């Protein structure tokens, strides 16, 4: 049995975060082994477009499509022992038998890399090198980043936990409230 993660249920919830005046910010706890690339990227785009303070905390794993989900927030944290895995787009059990399938996978991967580059400042070429790195994982390509390694690579803003992420979020919410009051 293959474990996958689906993100469809998040899309209407993210819309509510933006639309509901009683919600002042968003705190994302990320612990995923990956899953649906299309929905994951859609959720990441929605998170990035929210005009309220957003913060993410990687607390276990942020593998595959979890990377764009993690970096979509205004501020990103990773627990010291949490991992992020960057690897090429793939589909379990699929044999690529047509050039169109390969091109489709390449298009999905390019969309993901472009999003991560835009939200981290890490160059596309560096992200692609990490995705195809050999030797770090048995029978697979990719790079495993643990805690501060993700910060050193520029993918995550800082190492921290719940208290640091909430502290940042509360500061930003207060700053947003003050700006709204000044406009009145």
Question: Which residue stretches match the model-derived regions?
Answer:
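N-terminal organellar transit peptides
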Residues: 1-67, 71-184
């Amino acid at each position: 049995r293959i474990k996958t993660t689906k993100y469809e249920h998040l899309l209407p919830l993210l819309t509510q975060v933006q639309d509901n005046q009683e919600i002042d910010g968003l705190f994302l706890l990320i612990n995923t082994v990956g899953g649906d690339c299309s929905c994951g990227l859609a959720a990441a785009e929605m998170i990035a477009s929210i005009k309220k303070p957003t913060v993410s905390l990687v607390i276990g794993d942020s593998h595959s499509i979890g990377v764009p989900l993690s970096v979509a927030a205004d501020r990103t944290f990773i627990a010291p022992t949490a991992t992020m895995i960057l690897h090429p787009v793939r589909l379990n059990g699929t044999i690529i038998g047509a050039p169109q399938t390969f091109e489709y996978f390449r298009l999905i991967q390019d969309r993901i890399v472009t999003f991560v580059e835009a939200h981290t400042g890490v160059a596309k070429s560096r992200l692609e090198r990490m995705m195809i790195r050999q030797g770090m994982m048995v029978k697979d390509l990719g790079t495993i980043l643990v805690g501060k390694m993700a910060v050193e690579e520029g993918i995550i803003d800082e190492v921290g936990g719940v208290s640091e992420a909430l502290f940042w979020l509360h500061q930003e919410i207060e700053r947003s409230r003050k700006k709204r009051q000044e406009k009145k």
